[in-house]
Each structure stands twice: as structure tokens, then as C-alpha cells.
Design a protein with these regions (language model features):
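Extended alpha-helical targeting/anchoring segments
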Residues: 1-329
């Protein structure tokens, strides 16, 4: 494995299997959790037998997407600002000591909705969707890595603002600019481990995301590199070396992951892991954000954002709440 931050038996086994499939150009579906304690690889048939469903923006989906969604009802019960601030201050302490330049802090929020996980999967408007029965549903706006025609691309997403404030304010925000620069540099280095001619094709651009309560804006970047001709036989190693995704961890990655585990106080599990498919030629994948998990106590929505030395607890708390939405409209 190439310079991997995460080194677990599950990820090592997954990497070997993915390289085996890639060398033979055999299609597969994959899911890897944030801590890499669980790493699954299935043939398309095996995934469907388990009830796993997926939909990606190039039209690759397991089942047709229905029209005419029902009206959604969504209630959320976030932790208090005081509780959030305790976690926030742990992160800020690490930032002030110089242990991290950027740390992604997330929390769990109990929710109630009139729709089940499969309904949300079927009707959510999102480029990347995955449903795993009795586990979770993902409706992610963020691509992780795309491999196409011998090139590798990544599109880190950072920065969120409500529509009424507009994309211009998001793009001009100094804190958001610095956060984006840190993530872009991190992901550029990740690509450079496996490819050459790495370049930032688009540094920062705003995209609107429609929710059940109006629009929010987020900024993304586009970074690319050229893979060696034998990349298929190393496709598992390439993905594993870039985990966890930089946009949902931080920099420097190894120490920041430790800070995340200390401050959040619970494993993320599948949330902020990665999922994707390989069709024998190309690969596409997503970061598993916008995530609803089924637990013994009901449904839980996981959300958060990037913390820098210029962050404030009240703004980050509000961003965490703003990201609790279901794009059914």
C-alpha cells in the first residue's frame, strides 16, 4: 500500500481484492468506512443480492429512479450549542498548538421523517446515492475520485452558505478561501502519490444544491493527474492510499484523524467513508456525506464542517444544522 494513513486488516484485504479485480478488468462495487474497519467489495450481482442500490451521475444505477416524489416531513433534534462548543474547543486547542491546520468536525443529530430509507434513496435529488438495507442511505453531492481514459480526477468540496447570502459571499469569505486552499493542496499531494502531471484545473467554483427548504451553496475544486498505463492492477492501492478523503478529515491527515477521534467521541463508521464502482475500464466514487443512519434509537443524520483557526463555534454550529436536509422536492 502506498503511504496509507489508514492501515487496517480490512483495508489490506480490500486492496488485494480490488487489485485482483482491476488486473482482470472485472467490474465491482465498493464501500469503505471512515476508519477502514469495514471495507466491502462486491460484484454487481452480489451487491444487488444484498439489497444494495446505487445511482451515479453518468447514468450508472442499479434500478430506475422513479418520478413524482411525495411531500417530505423532516424534524431534527440537534445537540445544543453548548454541547457542540465542547467538541469545537477541543479542535480549536489542537489547531492553536499547530497539530492541525484544518479539522473536519461532525456530530450526530436524531431526526424524524415520514419517509423510509429506501424512499429517500428513490426520491432524493443528488448526483451520488447509495442505499444499504437496515443500515443507511447516502445522497451525496461530492465526488471523491473519478478515473477515466487514463486520468484521475478529484473534486474536494468545502464551504457552505445559505442561498439568501449568495455564492459571491461564500467565494469572498477569507476563512473559506484558506480552508479550500488547504484541502486543494492536500488532495493535490494525494494525487501526486499515484499520478504525474498533477494540476489544479479549477481552484474554486460555487455550486447550488437544492434542498427541501431552499438552496444552499457549496464550493468545489477540480484536480487531475495522469495515471500509468498499468493502473488497473493497482486500482485498489490507488484508492486506499488516498483514504480518508481530505475534505472530510483535514491536514495534516494522520494527526488530524486522531484529533477527530478524540473530539467527536464516537466512530463515524460508514459516514464520510467512500463508495463507488469500477466497470472494467473506468472508476467513479463519492464521499459518503449527507448521510442518514438507522440505529437502535431511530434515524440519525450525520453532518459537520471544516474548522480552522478563524472559525467560530456559532457559525460552525449553524452550518452543521444547515446541512441536515433531504433533497426531495
Amino acid at each position: 500500500m502506498i503511504n496509507a494513513v489508514l492501515k487496517t486488516p480490512a483495508l489490506s484485504s480490500w486492496t488485494e481484492k480490488a487489485n485482483f479485480f482491476g488486473a482482470r478488468k472485472l467490474p465491482f462495487v465498493f464501500l469503505i468506512d471512515f476508519e477502514a474497519g469495514n471495507a466491502e467489495i462486491f460484484t454487481f450481482h452480489e451487491a444487488l443480492e444484498k439489497g444494495i442500490r446505487w445511482s451515479f451521475p453518468d447514468g450508472h444505477r442499479s434500478v430506475p429512479v422513479p418520478q413524482h416524489p411525495p411531500a417530505i416531513q423532516l424534524e431534527k433534534y440537534p445537540i445544543s450549542l453548548e454541547e457542540y462548543d465542547q467538541k469545537f474547543q477541543q479542535v480549536m486547542s489542537a489547531l492553536q498548538y499547530g497539530d492541525s491546520f484544518l479539522t473536519n468536525l461532525t456530530v450526530s443529530t436524531p431526526i424524524k421523517t415520514n419517509l423510509g430509507l429506501l424512499d429517500i434513496y428513490r426520491f432524493a435529488n443528488a448526483p451520488f446515492k447509495v442505499y444499504w438495507p437496515d443500515k443507511f442511505v447516502v445522497f451525496s453531492p461530492e465526488r471523491f475520485v473519478k478515473i477515466q481514459s487514463g486520468k484521475i480526477y478529484t473534486y474536494p468540496m468545502k464551504g457552505t452558505i445559505k442561498d439568501e447570502k449568495g455564492a459571491e459571499q461564500l467565494l469572498s469569505n477569507i476563512k473559506e478561501q484558506e480552508e479550500k486552499a488547504t484541502v486543494v493542496d492536500l488532495m493535490r499531494n494525494d494525487l501526486a502519490m499515484n499520478s504525474r502531471d498533477v494540476q489544479v484545473e479549477r481552484f474554486r467554483y460555487a455550486e447550488a444544491i437544492q434542498t427541501d427548504r431552499g438552496k444552499i451553496w457549496q464550493t468545489s475544486s477540480k484536480i487531475s493527474g495522469r495515471l500509468p498505463s498499468f493502473f488497473h492492477e493497482k486500482i485498489g492501492s490507488i484508492i486506499a492510499s488516498m483514504l480518508p478523503a481530505g475534505s472530510i478529515s483535514g491536514a495534516p491527515k494522520k494527526r488530524t484523524v486522531e484529533i477527530i477521534q478524540e473530539s467527536e467521541g464516537e466512530p463515524r463508521g460508514w459516514y464520510t467513508g467512500v463508495c463507488g464502482y469500477y466497470d472494467g475500464a473506468d472508476l467513479d466514487s463519492a464521499v459518503m456525506i449527507r448521510f442518514i443512519e438507522k440505529t437502535d434509537k431511530g434515524l440519525v443524520f450525520r453532518s459537520g464542517g471544516g474548522i480552522t483557526a478563524k472559525s467560530t463555534a456559532d457559525q460552525e454550529y449553524q452550518e452543521m444544522i444547515d446541512k441536515i436536509y433531504v433533497p426531495v422536492y
